[in-house]
Curated annotation (Swiss-Prot):
Transmembrane helix is among the record's keywords: no
Gene designation: rplE
Name of this protein: Large ribosomal subunit protein uL5
Role according to the record: This is one of the proteins that bind and probably mediate the attachment of the 5S RNA into the large ribosomal subunit, where it forms part of the central protuberance. In the 70S ribosome it contacts protein S13 of the 30S subunit (bridge B1b), connecting the 2 subunits; this bridge is implicated in subunit movement. Contacts the P site tRNA; the 5S rRNA and some of its associated proteins might help stabilize positioning of ribosome-bound tRNAs.
Subunit (UniProt): Part of the 50S ribosomal subunit; part of the 5S rRNA/L5/L18/L25 subcomplex. Contacts the 5S rRNA and the P site tRNA. Forms a bridge to the 30S subunit in the 70S ribosome.
Length: 179
């Protein structure tokens, strides 16, 4: 089992129970899932770019990505409905905790000119979204084999009812928020 999951059960639950004075352990917010999304708009011209992006996402997450398709046609972007334009992965359970641990301890500190993550990126319901400009911050990606530096969106979905609860949950994991 992931160390971060054990830490959550042993330390974080107790800390949040006292901080928000919950009546039950089940009221304590928890991380439900982590979604990684990589939009590859250039895949319209070259299908190989989407395959490379999917391979990168599979290496980072340890799970085969789902190819996302365009919902509607947009003439300005030269896309038609049903065109493959990206890939995404939803992590739950053990893989989610392992990825979350790697994200906090290894990947985020490797971001160039890193001064902390914005605490304003909550959606109003306790879920946190962040963007990564380079996939090479993850140790699974070999810098020499990268065909193109591409970013991704990372969404951490929690069971928190408010942004304050979600912020407290992530801060308990030593999430590097900007001061």
């Amino acid at each position: 089992m992931a160390k971060l999951h054990d830490y959550y059960k042993d330390e974080v639950v107790k800390k949040l129970m006292t901080e928000f004075s919950y009546n039950s352990v089940m009221q304590v917010p928890r991380v439900e899932k982590i979604t990684l999304n990589m939009g590859v708009g250039e895949a319209i011209a070259d299908k190989k770019l989407l395959d490379n992006a999917a391979a990168d996402l599979a290496a980072i997450s340890g799970q085969k990505p789902f190819i996302t398709k365009a919902r509607k046609s947009v003439a300005g972007f030269k896309i038609r409905q049903g065109y493959p334009i990206g890939c995404k992965v939803t992590l739950r359970g053990e893989r989610m905790w392992e990825f979350f641990e790697r994200l906090i301890s290894i990947a985020v500190p490797r971001i160039r000119d890193f001064r902390g993550l914005s605490a304003k990126s909550f959606d109003g319901r306790g879920n946190y979204s962040m963007g990564v400009r380079e996939q090479i911050i993850f140790p699974e990606i070999d810098y020499d084999k990268v065909d193109r530096v591409r970013g991704m969106d990372i969404t951490i979905t929690t069971t928190a009812k408010s942004d304050d609860e979600g912020r407290a949950l992530l801060a308990a994991f030593n999430f590097p928020f900007r001061k």
